[in-house]
C-alpha cells in the first residue's frame, strides 16, 4: 500500500496541499509543480534497468552459486551487467560486497519483490485513474480487496480480485514515461 499511496503525492490536486514554503506557507507555484512532476520520469529507464540488474543478480547468485567451485560472485555479476547494464561501473567497484539486501534481512532471492510491488502499485492506481482519482466505489473496492485482507490472503489473488484481471506492466511503464518511447510488452 505504501507505494500505491505515493501516487497521490504526485497528483496536481494533492501536490499543492503537501508542498509549501517553510517560512511563508505559500504553496509551490504552478510552474514549479509542473517541473517537479516532469522530473518524476527523469532517468526512469536507467533506474528500472538497474533494479532489474539487482534482481537478476540476486536470482542467479542464489540459483547458481556452488561453493565447491569457489567464488563466482563477480563472474555472475559481470554476466548480468553485460546483459542488462547501460553504464559499466569502474573496475574498483565492489557492489556485490555491500549488496546486503540479498544476504540478510529476508530478501534472499526476493529482491525482485521491490519491482513487483511497483508493478502492482502502478496497476492498482490505474484503477483510480480510470474511474477518477478519488472515486469512492473504487476506494471501497481497494479497501475491501487489498487493505482489509492484508497478509491473510495471497497478494496476487487479492490484486486479481481488485482489478478483475492479472497485473499488467503497462501502467508502470506509462507512469515511468517509458511507454512513450515505443516499447511494447507483448
List PLM regions with ranges.
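Cation-handling catalytic/transport regions enriched in His/Asp/Glu
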Residues: 1-186
Amino acid at each position: 500500500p505504501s507505494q500505491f499511496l505515493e501516487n497521490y503525492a504526485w497528483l496536481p490536486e494533492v501536490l499543492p496541499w503537501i508542498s509549501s514554503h517553510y517560512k511563508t506557507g505559500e504553496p509551490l507555484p504552478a510552474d514549479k509543480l509542473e517541473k517537479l512532476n516532469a522530473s518524476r520520469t527523469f532517468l526512469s529507464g536507467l533506474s528500472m534497468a538497474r533494479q532489474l540488474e539487482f534482481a537478476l543478480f540476486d536470482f542467479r547468485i542464489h540459483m547458481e552459486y556452488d561453493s565447491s567451485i569457489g567464488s563466482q560472485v563477480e563472474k555472475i555479476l559481470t554476466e548480468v551487467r553485460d546483459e542488462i547494464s547501460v553504464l559499466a561501473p569502474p573496475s574498483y567497484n565492489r557492489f556485490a560486497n555491500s549488496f546486503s539486501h540479498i544476504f540478510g534481512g529476508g530478501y534472499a532471492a526476493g529482491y525482485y519483490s521491490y519491482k513487483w510491488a511497483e508493478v502492482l502499485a502502478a496497476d492498482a492506481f490505474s484503477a483510480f485513474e480510470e474511474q477518477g482519482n478519488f472515486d469512492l466505489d473504487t476506494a471501497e473496492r481497494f479497501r475491501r480487496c487489498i487493505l482489509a485482507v492484508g497478509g491473510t490472503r495471497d497478494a496476487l489473488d487479492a490484486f486479481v480480485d481488485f482489478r478483475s484481471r492479472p497485473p499488467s506492466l503497462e501502467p508502470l511503464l506509462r507512469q515511468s514515461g517509458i511507454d512513450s518511447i515505443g516499447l511494447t510488452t507483448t
